[in-house]
Amino acid sequence: QVMKAYGAELDLTPRALGMKGSMARAEEIAAQTPDAWIPSQFANPANPAVHRRTTVEEIARDFPEGLDYIVTGVGTGGHITACAEVLKERWPSLKVYAVEPTLSPVLSGGEHSPHPIQGIGPGFVPDVARPELFDGVIQVAPEDAMAYARRSAAEEGQLVGISTGASLAAVAQLRPEMPDGSRVLTFTYDSGERYLSVDALWSD
C-alpha cells in the first residue's frame, strides 16, 4: 500500500514461487524497460561493503570491549557477512550465528517452503553471504518468532516485526550455551507497525 501511495504499479508474483519468482519477474520487467536498473541486493557487493563502513563501525563504537555473540537473521546476507568478516578479526572469540526459518532451512542444507517470517529465509543462499564465516545456524519456527515479537512489545515496550522476533527466539535458544556475563548483539530490523494486519502475530 505504501508503494501504491507513491504511485508505483505493483506486479505481484505467486507466493509459491517465493523470492526467486519475484527476482525472475523483476529481471523480465527490466529487460523490457529502457534504462531500467535493479539494485540486486542479494548479489551486489556494495551491500556488505556499505555495512562494513557503517553498521560494523557503529557496533565497534558502541561495544568498545567487544562482543561474544552476534545472532541475526539472513535476508540478503549483507549485514551478517560484514559483521563476520570484520568483527571476528577484531574480536577473535566472537561467535556469529545465522537465524533462518524452520520452513526454509536452506543454510542448514534443507529445502525451502513458504513461511511467514518476512525479511529472512529467501529460499537460497545469497551471493553476498559467506556462510563459512558463521559459527552456526539457528532455526526458528514461525510461532516462536511471533511469540517473541509479542513479548518484546508487552515486556520491553518495543513493537517489532516478525523477523526481529525470530532473532530474539534464536538468542533464547542459544542462551543455555552462553556463559554468564556474555555480551550478545542482535538486530531490530523494522517496526511491528508494519505487521498490525497480520492476525496470527497478535493472537496468542
Regions flagged by a language model, labelled:
Residues E89-A98, P176-R183:
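Phosphate-handling active-site elements
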Residues G73-C83, S163-V171, Y195:
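Short glycine/serine/threonine-rich phosphate/pyrophosphate-binding segments
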Residues T72, Q139, G161, T186:
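Redox-cofactor binding/interface segments in oxidoreductases and associated redox assembly factors
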Residues S40-F42, G73-G75, A98-E100, L185-D190:
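Short beta-strand segments
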Residues A145-A166, P179:
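Glycine-rich phosphate/adenylate-binding loop
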Residues Q1-Y69, E100-A153:
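Small/polar-residue-rich loop-to-helix segments that shape phosphate-bearing ligand pockets
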Residues V50, T54-L94:
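Glycine-rich ThDP/TPP pyrophosphate-binding loop and its adjacent helix/strand module
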